[in-house]
Design a protein with these regions (language model features):
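Conserved redox-cofactor binding core of oxidoreductases
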Residues: 102, 106-109, 114-143, 252-346, ...
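Glycine-rich loop(s) and the adjacent beta-strand/alpha-helix scaffold that form part
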Residues: 169-178, 183-195, 223, 334, ...
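N-terminal FAD cofactor-binding segment of flavoenzymes
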Residues: 175, 182-241, 281-290
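Rossmann-like flavin
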Residues: 74-76, 81-86, 90, 94-95, ...
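FAD cofactor-binding and catalytic pocket of flavoenzymes
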Residues: 231, 249, 394-521, 568-573, ...
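Near-N-terminal "mature-domain entry" segment
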Residues: 1-67
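N-terminal Rossmann-like FAD-binding beta1-loop-alpha1 element of flavoenzymes
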Residues: 151-179
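Extreme N-terminal leader/targeting segments of oxidoreductases
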Residues: 4-5, 17, 24-32, 68, ...
Length: 631
């Protein structure tokens, strides 16, 4: 909680960002979200921010005037916040971004906070709920008592792309299986096309996850089925040149053997291009690429019976998305696997270097699972955190984190685009994928709903932001998926929670600059009226503008943390496979130094995949699980 004086200050900040919203409701919702995440430091940081902006002496140093924020008029408050946004001090920039993102997301995502009034201005209308599938998902969570010990042959930690496949392979081979999933269970009737509920229910840290400095927003699923429940269904195989790289790093079987696993996975999750229809945003990307003579291809997706509602990022109410929950996990349960949701694996237990099981917390109940084998599939953030809490994985555990940083580029078009409508991703271009050997970026588009848009769009003043939001239905975003080579790291805090450290630097920073410039050119070629970057002071180019000057301006401004919007939906590495001692796991995905411990998620990647990783996670999980079961 925060005290009354701090709440009053927070209300004034929220009212500055969005005067048309209900500032009191927004302020209380911010506190509620941070409390729900359950990390006391987040609230402590908020209190510090609120105290600083009310301290006259501090503000002499920070903004050059002995003022209290709450004493300023609206224009003075806006100028104050811009000083924080534009500051050379990283902590001030991150403080601004934290409160700005929360305030604006809540204002546009919650009816009582302002969305009832603000959403109609954007041109957004919530779609009618799609018809439920004939057979909704029906995976019941195992009932457990405090202090209970369960037993199985194989304990799988995580139920996403890798965990579900590993659970099925083990159960199909006749092993007894228990799956521990930190997120909640769900069924299609629980899924509604509302951002606030979907983010809180289905995403890590309620959709608010980020690197420790807030420089990169992290989107990661945390629910039964993991990221496959909330992703955009893009199903791409690992390119041949990157497979060769991985082979050189010791991850064997990347050729014909992996193709067999890809084919099996594609068949089970029904990957196809039959229903990959272009919406206006994907059509704009294709049109711009065509105009520039650049290649593009149709994206295969794991969907059947898609209703084109565009709200795939918050789960598929129609059951058309062939997530791991509806496919492999359902198959595993049919073969006897047991599932426990809302259950966090805390430590891996061992005796003399051999796995004996897992300790876990399910609400207020502490349980133990005895198992001959443990499969780690909690993702590239959750898996290393579990290894680090357990003192396993060696010095490389948590290192070599890759994020595919995305510096999105925004443009206004003369015709309606409605980024939230239709198939989210249907076009991908690898025209820029090999600008520096195997490094570059692939161009795609994201589905963007008003809450996420409001949080990400540049804020220079309340009026400026509202003006952009009022034209939201005519904006399109292109997202360059940058294959990064400079890794980050996952650590844990004193409570064992994951901390993600990552900086876009060196060659990756240069590639992000190039990605912004090339994305802008594609927008212009597609007929955009104006293109703007996501810098806190946006750089704008219009048709006929000087692209050389634009590129120079982007290069000069750079991509330092919290000076430009950056997000990641692909977290990889941190328990990478390889033949050398620098790898956490061997070429079979077995963790070095601990018998019976295996990796089956994106943390096993030796480096960045360069393409959306879901299909590769599933294929590798199938391969690694089968190798494990042969031992």
């Amino acid at each position: 909680m925060i005290g009354p004086p701090e709440r009053a200050t927070l209300v004034s900040v929220c009212g500055t960002f969005v005067p048309e919203g209900n500032a009191g409701v927004i302020a209380d919702a911010i506190v509620g979200e941070l409390e729900a995440i359950g990390r006391p430091k987040l609230l402590a940081d908020l209190r510090l921010f609120l105290r600083l902006i009310e301290t006259r002496a501090v503000n002499v140093v920070l903004v050059g005037r002995p003022v209290r924020f709450s004493d300023l008029a609206q224009d003075g408050r806006e100028a104050y916040l811009r000083r924080w946004a534009d500051s050379r001090i990283p902590l001030l920039r991150s403080g601004f971004q934290a409160v700005k993102r929360l305030s604006l997301f809540i204002a546009y995502a919650r009816p009582e906070a302002g969305a009832a009034k603000l959403l109609p201005e954007t041109g957004y209308s919530r779609p009618d709920p799609l018809a439920l599938p004939e057979r909704p998902l029906a995976i019941a969570s195992l009932a457990v008592r405090d202090g209970e010990t369960l037993g199985c042959d194989v304990c799988v930690v995580g139920s996403g792309a890798g965990g579900a496949v590993a659970a099925f392979e083990a159960a199909n081979a006749g092993r007894s299986v228990i799956v521990l999933e930190r997120g909640p269970g769900w069924s299609e009737p629980d899924l509604v096309p509302r951002e606030s509920e979907g983010s809180a229910r289905l995403f890590w840290d309620r959709g608010l996850a980020a690197t420790v400095d807030l420089g990169v927003v992290l989107f990661a699923g945390r629910a039964l089925g993991g990221g496959t429940v909330v992703n955009w269904m893009t199903s791409l195989r690992l390119p041949d040149d990157i497979r060769a790289e991985w082979e050189a790093l010791g991850a064997d079987g990347m050729g014909a053997e992996l193709d067999e696993h890809y084919a099996a996975v594609e068949e089970r999750i029904e990957v196809n291009t039959d229903e990959t229809v272009q919406n206006a945003q994907n059509a704009a990307l294709a049109r711009g690429l065509d105009a520039l003579g650049k290649p593009w291809s149709v994206i295969p997706r794991n969907a059947r019976g898609c209703g084109d509602c565009g709200h795939c990022g918050y789960g598929c109410r129609a059951g058309a998305k062939r997530s791991s929950a509806r496919t492999y996990l359902t198959d595993a349960v049919a073969r006897g696997a047991r599932v426990l949701t809302d259950c966090e694996a805390r430590t891996i237990t061992t005796t003399n270097g051999v796995v004996t099981g897992v300790t876990a917390v399910a609400g207020d109940r502490h349980i133990s699972v005895r198992a001959d084998r443990v499969v780690l599939a909690g993702g590239a953030i959750g898996t290393p955190a579990l290894l680090l809490r357990s003192g396993l994985g060696g010095p490389a555990a948590g290192r070599r984190l890759f994020l595919h940083p995305v510096p999105a580029v925004f443009a206004r078009y003369p015709e309606p685009i409605r980024m939230w409508s239709g198939v989210p991703q249907s076009v991908v271009s690898d025209a820029f994928a090999r600008l520096d050997g195997t490094y570059g970026f692939r161009l795609e588009v994201p589905p963007v709903l008003p809450g996420v848009a409001a949080a990400g769009i540049v804020w220079r003043s309340a009026a400026h932001h509202r003006e952009t939001m009022r034209a939201l239905d005519r904006f399109a975003a292109f997202i360059p998926i940058v294959r990064d080579r400079e890794p980050g790291r996952v650590r844990v805090d004193r409570d064992g929670a994951a901390l993600v450290s990552y900086a876009v630097r060196g060659a990756d920073a240069a590639m992000c600059v190039r990605a912004i410039v090339e994305s802008a050119k594609v927008h212009l070629a597609a007929g955009a009226l104006a293109v703007r970057t996501f810098h806190t002071r946006p750089i704008v180019i219009e048709p006929g503008g000087d692209t050389t000057a634009f590129a120079a301006a982007v290069r000069s401004r750079g991509v330092a943390a919290n000076t430009v919007g950056m997000f990641s939906a692909h977290q990889m590495g941190t328990a990478g496979m390889g033949s050398g001692s620098a790898s956490v796991s061997d070429p079979d995905g077995a963790v070095r130094g601990t018998r019976g411990l295996h990796v089956a998620d994106a943390s096993a990647f030796p480096n960045a995949s360069g393409v959306n990783p879901m299909l590769t996670v599933m294929a590798l999980a199938r391969r690694n699980a089968r190798r494990m079961l042969r031992v």
